[in-house]
């Protein structure tokens, strides 16, 4: 009995020691890293629906040579979606969360991203990329470039129409404030200073368009204004000339009336003088006849 008790005690001690050692080994082997977090929309969806488990499928960043080789092979039954972007372009950085959402929503499509500096210009010319960001869907028979609006719902419709695949889930990227993704912004929500700070290229593009329109229409407006002023001045000069001519005619008419009056006065004076002269002649003739008669009578007496 004593031997059995000793054996049992030793076995119990060994078991406790082994458990403690195992526990210490596990603590030593525990990694000191944080688990990788998925995109913000996946975390938001998991917080809303804890029962749904969606593994994020981020796109693969490749160089230009690798994507050219992959697209040249075009494996049978494989569909590729390629995002061409530029690190300096603010639209590209804002579009990345949407492309990550598409990669998770369509895991049956291989998603790749190509940065501008990692590819030759001939690659962009080959696939018709003239601006960033640009999306290209490629399968074994077709190659389609997306030209529509770059919102999630439009891109999902484009994927479904081009590939025939349906998304495994629908995400809403536009309202994720914590991840810094797209949000619908109305013009009244942001001031001009904030727009210039957040999107300077948009402001520069708008200013360029305004200057272009002004450079086109300002000379036309100035020429029409000059023509209007010239016609207006000519009409004004004609009016002034007509008015002055009328005044001159009136002045001449007044002068003519004065001359006529003076002529009438002169004619009246000459008429009076003539009458006086004729009266004087008659009076003189009568006086001479009377004097002659008196002299003859005195002689007869």
Swiss-Prot record:
Residue ranges annotated for the Thioredoxin domain, each copy included: 51-164
Predominant subcellular localization, coarse grouping: membrane
Membrane topology: Single-pass membrane protein
Residue ranges crossing the lipid bilayer per the database entry: 201-221
Signal peptide: 1-21
GO cellular component, one term: membrane
Keywords tagged on the record: Glycoprotein, Membrane, Signal, Transmembrane, Transmembrane helix
Residues the record marks as carrying a glycan: 139, 268
Top-level taxonomic group: Eukaryota
Record's subcellular location: Membrane
PANTHER family from the UniProt entry: 5'-ADENYLYLSULFATE REDUCTASE-LIKE 5, 5'-ADENYLYLSULFATE REDUCTASE-LIKE 7
Protein name: 5'-adenylylsulfate reductase-like 5
